[in-house]
Amino acid sequence: MDKIYISNQVKLEILRICGQPTHKAYNLPGNLTLDIFNYGYNEELCRILEQKLQEIASQYQTGKIILPGDVCKNHTVSECIKMVFA
């Protein structure tokens, strides 16, 4: 699958999980940290994102495994994207 498509899917999930508008998820800059989107105030959001990243990795058979605790508020959007690629 196209890496750009998967990257945009990750960006969409980052925004969707925290309740932000998703209509232009593809424009989300890679250098933004998750705490900007309130992931720092609610640890459960990180756990949900981990599950979604694992679903994306499994769906597109990237070979990556995302475990509980792998995502934290200090991760950037780019780091989250890299988690799903082998």
Predicted feature locations:
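Phosphopantetheine-dependent thiolation modules in NRPS/PKS and related acyl-activating systems
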Residues: 1-55, 60-86
